[in-house]
């Protein structure tokens, strides 16, 4: 059965046989799926230049198994201009989606978050607020429910000036211990508001999302993070 024409993006692509590609897509109506792009590696194939990350596409495919066959791919708009840090940030977002969301699970809301994230990476001078916002939105969609407004121990509202220690599967508990799991109340209130305009809040948010995403990512390192680190070292 052939799918309806859908908006989507390439998350990742790799060789498949001598002339084809195996392509991980993220689509608006069908979520993440893997397709074979037959002949895409051939010299005269128009798909070779079309099937690139960060290019908004119109896509159609066929097949009932988990591995579909791509039948149509054309640009819906120009490729978003990501380069250097923004490019590696885009690869990071793509790898997150590839690693943590289930295949063929429709999620139009996440697609919109992803589209806004890429647009933000392409237009904003600082990538950090855009990345932190997307990570928190992704956690919400994954069902990661944590209360940023109340102490998990007492039920009292979070105090702006107090410190709270994160306990997995429980939440934030008022604590005087200061370590990697400790956050200020002002950070938690900003997390709830999805307000990452302050640099200190962004640093705390980055620390929290690494903790929160670890159960979904497992122990396997993110390749995009390694590439980014290598690139920074080369630039020094």
From Swiss-Prot:
Gene3D superfamilies annotated for this entry? Nucleic acid-binding proteins, Recombination protein O, C-terminal domain
Alphabetized UniProt keyword annotations: DNA damage, DNA recombination, DNA repair
* Annotated TM spans: none
Q: Which domain of life is it from?
A: Bacteria
Q: Name one GO biological process term.
A: DNA recombination
Q: Kindly list the GO CC terms recorded for this protein.
A: bacterial nucleoid
Q: Which Pfam families match?
A: RecO_C, RecO_N
Q: Which family does it belong to?
A: Belongs to the RecO family.
Q: What does this protein do?
A: Involved in DNA repair and RecF pathway recombination.
The protein in question is named DNA repair protein RecO
Species the sequence originates in: Haemophilus influenzae (strain PittEE)
Gene name tied to this protein: recO
């Amino acid at each position: 059965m052939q799918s309806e024409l859908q908006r989507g993006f390439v998350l990742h692509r790799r060789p498949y046989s001598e002339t084809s590609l195996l392509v991980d897509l993220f689509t608006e109506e069908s979520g993440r799926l893997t397709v074979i792009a037959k002949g895409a590696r051939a010299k005269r194939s128009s798909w070779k230049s079309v099937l690139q990350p960060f290019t908004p596409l119109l896509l159609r495919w066929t097949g009932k198994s988990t591995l579909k066959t791509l039948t149509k791919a054309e640009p819906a708009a120009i490729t978003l201009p990501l380069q250097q840090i923004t490019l590696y940030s885009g690869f990071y977002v793509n790898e997150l989606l590839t690693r943590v969301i289930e295949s063929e699970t429709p999620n139009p809301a996440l697609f919109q978050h992803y589209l806004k994230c890429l647009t933000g990476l392409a237009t904003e001078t600082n990538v950090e607020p855009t990345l932190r916002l997307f990570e928190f939105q992704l956690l919400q969609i994954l069902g990661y429910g944590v209360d940023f407004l109340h102490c998990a121990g007492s039920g009292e509202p979070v105090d702006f000036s107090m410190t709270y220690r994160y306990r997995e599967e429980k939440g934030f508990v008022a604590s005087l211990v200061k370590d990697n799991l400790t956050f200020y109340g002002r950070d938690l209130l900003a997390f709830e508001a999805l307000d990452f305009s302050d640099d200190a809040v962004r640093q705390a948010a980055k620390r929290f999302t690494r903790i929160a995403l670890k159960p979904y990512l497992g122990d396997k390192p993110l390749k995009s993070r390694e590439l980014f680190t290598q690139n920074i070292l080369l630039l020094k």
